[in-house]
A protein has these predicted regions:
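Nucleotide/pyrophosphate-binding catalytic subdomain
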Residues: 1-239, 248
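Acidic, glycine-rich loop-and-beta core segments that form the ion-binding/anion-interacting portion
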Residues: 242
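Conserved small/polar residues in nucleotide/adenosyl-binding loops
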Residues: 247-254
Length: 258
């Protein structure tokens, strides 16, 4: 993996995605405010360099569950599970955005909320409007904070995970760089949480079928929907546009501009 400072240095428009497991304390599931503050501080610092920044954030459903002290129970119907998920998203998204607004305000930075579904992308008019909204917000110097609109998204219109969403956003706004922050520090030959012999792959120059197959062995965390497979898919979507390059960092340890 190349030094992230070198990757960011010549880039103008950057999309950063952070997952649920990187936003919370593993032991309690509560929001990790120290990590959130560090992320926001670094995004503001990048913005102060004259770069345009978009944050794609997970964590709404998990934050909502934590707020109402909800634990998963057996025997729920699919409709009941969907209703609980959407209700928790409604609660959690408000709490999550309130936290981001407060943190960004500490650095005199304006944040803007954008919630998306698959219809935002597949419908030409919606996609055009979304592109214009992002463009105008970035011209204003705001940092768009993006999440999937889980409150209204059903199976038919959901994007499914924010790794994919971040790649879609990067392509939509013609970003120069997509950075995925997660609880694993890059690509391995197998899931390192399950296989201690999994080997770290420092850099991938071409997303061959072999590399895509490696991602399928990895599942998501206990609090999120993404895994290594979704990150490989995101990389493929992002790099299909010649303008977008891609990197994957461990959010727990890695600064965005070391």
């Amino acid at each position: 993996m190349n030094n992230i400072r070198e990757q960011i240095k010549d880039k103008k428009r950057i999309v950063v995605k952070i997952g649920s497991s990187s936003l919370q304390h593993a032991e309690t599931g509560d929001l990790d405010y120290t990590r959130l503050e560090k992320l926001v501080r670094e995004l503001c610092d990048i913005s102060n360099q004259g770069k345009e920044v978009v944050l794609v954030t997970s964590g709404a459903i998990a934050a909502g569950k934590q707020a109402v002290h909800l634990k998963t129970t057996e025997g729920q119907t699919q409709a009941e599970s969907m209703a609980i998920k959407q209700a928790c998203s409604a609660i959690g998204q408000a709490r999550l955005m309130m936290t981001y607004q407060k943190l960004f305000a500490e650095y005199n930075q304006v944040a803007a909320q954008i919630l998306m579904t698959k219809n935002t992308i597949v419908d030409n008019l919606n996609r055009y409007n979304a592109h214009n909204t992002f463009t105008q917000l970035l011209k204003m110097g705001a940092i768009p904070v993006v999440n999937e609109n889980d409150t209204v998204a059903t199976y038919e219109i959901e994007i499914g995970d924010n790794d994919t969403l971040s790649a879609i956003v990067a392509a939509l706004i013609d970003a120069d760089l997509l950075i995925l922050l997660s609880d694993i520090d890059g690509l391995y030959t197998d899931d390192p949480r399950q296989n201690p012999n999994a080997e770290f792959i420092e850099q991938v120059d071409e997303l061959t079928e072999e590399f895509m197959h490696m991602g399928k062995a990895s599942t998501g965390s206990n609090v999120g929907t993404g895994g290594m497979n979704t990150k490989m898919i995101a990389a493929k979507i992002a790099t299909s546009s010649d303008a977008v390059s891609y990197t994957h960092l461990r959010a727990h340890e890695t600064s965005l501009h070391l």
